Amino acid sequence: MSSWFLSLDNAAVLIDCPKVTEEVINDLKELSGGICPNVVLTNRDAHHDASILNRKLGWPLIVQEQEAYLLPHVENLVTFSEELTLSSGARLLWTPGPTPGSCVLHVPPPWNVLFCGRLLTPGSNDQISPIRTRSTFHWTMYQESLLKLRNWLPREQPPLLASGQRLHLLSDEKLLPWIAWNPSAE
């Protein structure tokens, strides 16, 4: 799972949580510049490390309510059901399928990036698409979430795409253009 740290105009957001080590803790403290970033978890893969980070730094964790039970002793736990807008203007959308509480985060222009966690996975030819695996929670819900996501995003300016999965397949590219989303794979 890949993590992303965003320094926005009036806030910071850590999207998914890296493996927590002392070096990572020090790097995150430096990146945060003394503010208290929100930690958004797009799926349950990083819950253990996120709870350690929360305990060490006190940063609030934001999860979709379906997965809040996995973080019983976390302070500053923020949950949402369908959608949530952060103070930075970034918006979260519940997109069940990969896990019951999967979500995506859209950061509006000027950044205009969709952080899609495990919802969309890089493949060959710089394409990104849904992948059904043994650990996929519910394939029909997954497909419905993809349709809901397409209707939720602003159509006038499609976002860049950032996946939390297997970035090494993307060679040097970290963000993909909207047209890399392969709807035929759905």
Task: List each language-model region with its residue ranges.
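Active-site HxH/HxHxD metal-binding segment of metal-dependent hydrolases
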Residues: P18-S88, W181-A185
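Residue-level marker for the onset of beta-strands and adjacent loop->beta junctions
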Residues: S2, F80, G101-C103
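A generic structural signal for short, solvent-exposed coil/turn residues
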Residues: S7, L53, P72, L84, ...
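Short hydrophobic/charged patches on amphipathic alpha-helices used for structural packing
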Residues: S3, I25-K29, L93
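Generic structural signal for well-ordered alpha-helical scaffold segments
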Residues: F5, K29, L147-N151
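Metallo-beta-lactamase
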Residues: A11-V20, R91-W94, T99-A185
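Short, compositionally biased "basic patch" segments
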Residues: M1-S7
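Residue-level preference for short coil/turn positions at secondary-structure junctions
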Residues: L8-N10, I35, L57, L86-S88, ...
